[in-house]
Amino acid sequence: METEIPRSTEISETLLLPETNLDHGEYVPEWKEQITIRGLISSALLGILFCIITHKLNLTIGIIPSLNVAAGLLGFFFIKSWTGFLSKLGFLSKPFTKQENTVIQTCVVSCYGLAYSGGFGSYLIAMDERTYKLIGSDYPGNNPEDVINPGLWWMTGFLFVVSFLGLFCLVPLRKVMILDYKLTYPSGTATAMLINSFHNNTGAELAGKQVKCLGKYLSLSLVWSCFKWFFSGIGGACGFDHFPTLGLTLFKNTFYFDFSPTFIGCGMICPHLVNCSVLLGAIISWGFLWPFISQHAGDWYPADLKANDFKGLYGYKVFIAISIILGDGLYNLIKIIVVTVKEICNKSSRQHNLPVFTDILDKSKTSVLMREKKKRDIIFLKDRIPLEFAVSGYVGLAAISTAIIPLIFPPLKWYFVLCSYLVAPGLAFCNSYGAGLTDMSMPSTYGKTGLFIVASIVGNNGGVIAGLAACGIMMSIVSTAADLMQDFKTGYLTLSSAKSMFVTQLLGTAMGCIIAPLTFWLFWTAFDIGDPDGLYKAPYAVIYREMAILGVEGFAKLPKHCLALCCGFFIAALIVNLIRDMTPPKISKLIPLPMAMAGPFYIGAYFAIDMFVGTVIMLVWERMNKKDADDYSGAVASGLICGDGIWTIPSAILSILRINPPICMYFRPS
């Protein structure tokens, strides 16, 4: 996810209760039995769906919520439906265990994770000719030789050589991070509790209702998306996606509700603070800042420039958004490194500050808890992953990657790739440890760091491509390492084998290396990707290419006062984060998140309206019936997102066949 947000908030507290009700006599299958053919088939189908959803979000707004709940729920639904169907035909089927459910969820998440860390909405597409032309052929540092257009084969090959290294670099530390440090990995813990709840009587009944709820809203979302298509016309300015719900004046400043089930679903999943931060960012930028700068057209920048010219207002939009993102990312990177070092060095602090389960249980339950913990520890450590296997795997893959990547990206020399792999394990540890403490995984922040360093060293002789490729290497390793450790936590709490988790991650990553490029290619061939006036703007492609150019050229060619404004917003992002950490929780939870505020500065205000509608729905629902909201909101939101995502497939096929919508619904002043 480009905008990285805490993910644990999407699961209600009631799902944590089954943790204390572990049945000590339950059968735990061997690690090979936890990985089934039906599970892998379900994972592949769900991986396709979630890759499409991730691409759609990545290419429109760049904010991707966690889909772990939907993956676990739909995995449960697929296998239960399959076993139920076979039983009606008179066939006996293997019992569906929580370990198999965990394997499916892990496989799906590792598969669709590559749709994000693979850079299809950021660093890879930033290399293409459209992004080059959008910035301008006469723009300093934007050279025609720094162009590599997307290709299905080279993108697939690139993913295969970079995506597996992160799985090997931290495997030897799984005992240290899960058992010794007792890192919580809130999203992994919450997902485990959700899966545990599915496989007891009470939880199975609720899960059945959640599946029905998800199916209902998935159908509604699919039908609505199909209905909208008939009015969307040719081009990008027709239909409900451009409905001036707040009036034509505000519509010109991108303030309108576009009836998007995906964005409403995102608003229901994301914390209220994230949605309010996004809306605040939209109000500051499109309500005040851009109109103010527009008044100085002809003074600060030439008045006759095109809307997408970086010498004009467009330059302010992109570079101020970059400044906020970098300020927020730098602060959190330093914060997590400091917390990591402090926690490692201070053993007593680690024991008292980390939320260990024994802290919240009565003394009468201590013996039960100890038996539960002992059983988990035994199962987690039972199937070893040899140290020599992990080390040799990392070294071997790094050697192959060091040889192949310079063939794909000639400006990125082999010694840059080698240096990246030497420092990557340390950065992966920092990110994984930080994710375990705070639930914030920040692969794009580490990637941008590598981007700037490599681009500035290489310079004008291919620095843009080299920086973007280095960003991809770092993002892939750091992201997959954190995901693996989080899945180890999920497996630990569901009595799943660590070896089955690791093998499933390998299988899911292999699926993702094929599925993610194929599903992206569907978008690439069917839609006008990167059109700033279209639906699939690919907003972060321009931002990443500009970052690389900035690393090569410096700040000399920015529009008038742009550097001063960028510095101001960069410092503001640092200060806001510092205030959030220094104030009491009652106050800090009301302070906006700079990273969430940055998106609308460049993309527009319309998706902020949609996401705020989602948060209003949740607030009203929680006020009316909090238990139902806790139980079913995730299913409703996932249904809205999945239904709209499924419609992308027939929509893309119609576009490829040149079948256009029959009606253009358009609005103009009377």
From Swiss-Prot:
Q: List the disulfide bonds.
A: none
Question: Can you say where in the cell this protein is located?
Answer: Membrane
Indicate whether Membrane appears among the record's keywords. yes
Entry GO terms, CC: plant-type vacuole; plant-type vacuole membrane
- What parts of the sequence cross the membrane? 35-55, 59-79, 107-127, 151-171, 273-293, 318-338, 389-409, 416-436, 450-470, 507-527, 559-579, 601-621, 636-656
Q: Which UniProt keywords apply?
A: Membrane, Transmembrane, Transmembrane helix, Transport
List, in alphabetical order, the Gene Ontology terms for molecular function in this entry: oligopeptide transmembrane transporter activity
Q: Which InterPro entries does the record cross-reference, listed alphabetically?
A: OPT, YSL-like
Gene Ontology BP terms: iron ion transmembrane transport
Q: How does it sit in the membrane?
A: Multi-pass membrane protein
Pfam families this protein is in? OPT
Origin superkingdom: Eukaryota
Q: Which family does it belong to?
A: Belongs to the YSL (TC 2.A.67.2) family.
In its miscellaneous comment, the UniProt entry states:
Up-regulated in autophagy mutant.
NCBIfam families, per the entry: OPT_sfam
What's its job? Answer: May be involved in the transport of nicotianamine-chelated metals.
Q: What is this protein called?
A: Probable metal-nicotianamine transporter YSL4
Instruction: List the source organism.
Output: Arabidopsis thaliana (Mouse-ear cress)
Annotated gene: YSL4
